[in-house]
C-alpha cells in the first residue's frame, strides 16, 4: 500500500461515526443516522459547501447556551450566531414533532433567538417540518414551505420544480421521503399499513409517469399555498387524478380501470409536496431499489417467515451469476423483486453498451429490443400475492 493511500485509512471504533461534514468522530445513536443523511443531502443534492455548515453549533438563548444540530451560513460569512441562515434539528424516530422538549417548538425557539435565521427544518426520519420565519410588526410567525432552498436562496422551484431542477436522491434520503409519506398516510388518513403502502405506490407511479410525459410541463407538484387551503388541495387532487388515469391505461395489469387515489386532499397534497423535488428517473438504481424494497418489507412482510435478502447480497449474487441477454431468469421466491430488478438492469446496460456505437438512427430499435427483453426474460413466483404485485411495480 502506498504512503498516500495508507495516510487516508482511518479506524472508526464501534459505536462511533465519522461525521460527513467536519470529519469528527461522534457517538452513533439513532438520531445521528438521520443527521448524517441530511448532511449528505445538503451537500450532494442541494449544493451547499461543507465549509458553510457547522455541526452542533452553540447559540445563546437568554442566559443559557444550546447546540443546534446543523447550522448553515451564507457563503463567506463567519460562523457566529448572528450569521446563521438555516437551522436543522434531527431527532430519533420515536420523538414526535409535538414533543414538548425536542419537537418543533424547540426549533422555533432556536430560530426566534437567532435574528437572521430565516429557514428551519425539523425531522426524525419519518416526519418532517419546514419553516420560513417572517417578522411582521415586531411579531414572528412561521410559514410552512415544501423545503429549504439551496445556497442561492432561490425559492422559485421549491413550489413548482422543472425537470432540469429535479434532484437525484442520495443515500437514504429517498427512503426517508417514502417513510415520511407513508407515516403521514397512516396517521392522517387512518389507513392500516398495507392499504397505506399501496396508496403511496399509486402516487409514486404518478410521479414517474409525470416525469416521463415529455415534453409537457410537470404536473406533479403542490405549492405551499395550495397545501394550506381546501380549494388548493382539491386542485392538487385533480392534477394527480389526471396523471393516475394515464397510469391505469399503461399498467392495467397492476391497476384496474375503476381504481382511484383514495387519499384525503390534505394528505395527498402533503405527499406530493414531499416527493416533487426528486427526479425518480435520474436517481441511481441502487438508491431507488433500497428505498422501495425497505418500504415494501416494512409493510408487506407477512407471517410466512419472509426474509428479504439485503441489497448488497443481491448484488453479489447477480455478479456471480453474470446473466446474459437471451437467457431466461426465474426467482421462485421473488419477494420484492430485488434479484430480478438487478439482473434486468444489468442486462439492459449490456445491450445499451453493445448498441452505443450505432448512433441515433438505431436508438428506437435499441429501445424496442430493451422493452422486449424486459417483458419476456424475467419471471418470479411468491406465496404472498401482495408481494407479487409489489414486484411488478418494482420492475416497472
Question: Predicted regions span which residues?
Answer:
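Charged, often flexible domain-edge or linker segments that flank or initiate folded functional domains
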Residues: 119-122, 126-246, 340, 362, ...
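Structural motif
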Residues: 29-33, 186-201, 262, 281-284
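Class I SAM-dependent transferase core
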Residues: 184-185, 287-312, 318-323
Amino acid at each position: 500500500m502506498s504512503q498516500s493511500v495508507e495516510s487516508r485509512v482511518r479506524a472508526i471504533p464501534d459505536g462511533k461515526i465519522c461525521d460527513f461534514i467536519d470529519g469528527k468522530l461522534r457517538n452513533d445513536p439513532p438520531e445521528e443516522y438521520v443527521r448524517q443523511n441530511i448532511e449528505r443531502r445538503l451537500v450532494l443534492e442541494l449544493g451547499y459547501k461543507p465549509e458553510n455548515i457547522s455541526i452542533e453549533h452553540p447559540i445563546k438563548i437568554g442566559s443559557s447556551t444550546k447546540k443546534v444540530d446543523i447550522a448553515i451560513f451564507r457563503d463567506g460569512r463567519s460562523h457566529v450566531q448572528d450569521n446563521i441562515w438555516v437551522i436543522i434539528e434531527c431527532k430519533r424516530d420515536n420523538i414526535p414533532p409535538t414533543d414538548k422538549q425536542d419537537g418543533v417548538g424547540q426549533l422555533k425557539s432556536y430560530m426566534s433567538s437567532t435574528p437572521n435565521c430565516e429557514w428551519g427544518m425539523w425531522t426524525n426520519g419519518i416526519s418532517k417540518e419546514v419553516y420560513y420565519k417572517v417578522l411582521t410588526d415586531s411579531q414572528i410567525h412561521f410559514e410552512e414551505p415544501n423545503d429549504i432552498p439551496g445556497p442561492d436562496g432561490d425559492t422559485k422551484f421549491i413550489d413548482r420544480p422543472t425537470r432540469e431542477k429535479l434532484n437525484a436522491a442520495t443515500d437514504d434520503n429517498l427512503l426517508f421521503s417514502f417513510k415520511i409519506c407513508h407515516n403521514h398516510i397512516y396517521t392522517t388518513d387512518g389507513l392500516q399499513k398495507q392499504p397505506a403502502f399501496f396508496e403511496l405506490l399509486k402516487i409514486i407511479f404518478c410521479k414517474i409517469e409525470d416525469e416521463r410525459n415529455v415534453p409537457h410541463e410537470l404536473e406533479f407538484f403542490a405549492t405551499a399555498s395550495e397545501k394550506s387551503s381546501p380549494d388548493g388541495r382539491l386542485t392538487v387532487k385533480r392534477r394527480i387524478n389526471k396523471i393516475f388515469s394515464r397510469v391505469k391505461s399503461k399498467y392495467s395489469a397492476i391497476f384496474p380501470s375503476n381504481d382511484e387515489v383514495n387519499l384525503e386532499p390534505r394528505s395527498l397534497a402533503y405527499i406530493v409536496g414531499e416527493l416533487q423535488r426528486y427526479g425518480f428517473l435520474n436517481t441511481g438504481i441502487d438508491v431507488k431499489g433500497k428505498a422501495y424494497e425497505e418500504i415494501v418489507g416494512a409493510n408487506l412482510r407477512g407471517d410466512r417467515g419472509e426474509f428479504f435478502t439485503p441489497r448488497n447480497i443481491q448484488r453479489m449474487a447477480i455478479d456471480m451469476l453474470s446473466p446474459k441477454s437471451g437467457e431466461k431468469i426465474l426467482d421462485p421466491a421473488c419477494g420484492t423483486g430485488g434479484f430480478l430488478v438487478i439482473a434486468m438492469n444489468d442486462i439492459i446496460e449490456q445491450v445499451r453498451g453493445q448498441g452505443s456505437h450505432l448512433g441515433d438512427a438505431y436508438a428506437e430499435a435499441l429501445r424496442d429490443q430493451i422493452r422486449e427483453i424486459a417483458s419476456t426474460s424475467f419471471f418470479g413466483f411468491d406465496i404472498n400475492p401482495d408481494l407479487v404485485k409489489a414486484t411488478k411495480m418494482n420492475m416497472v
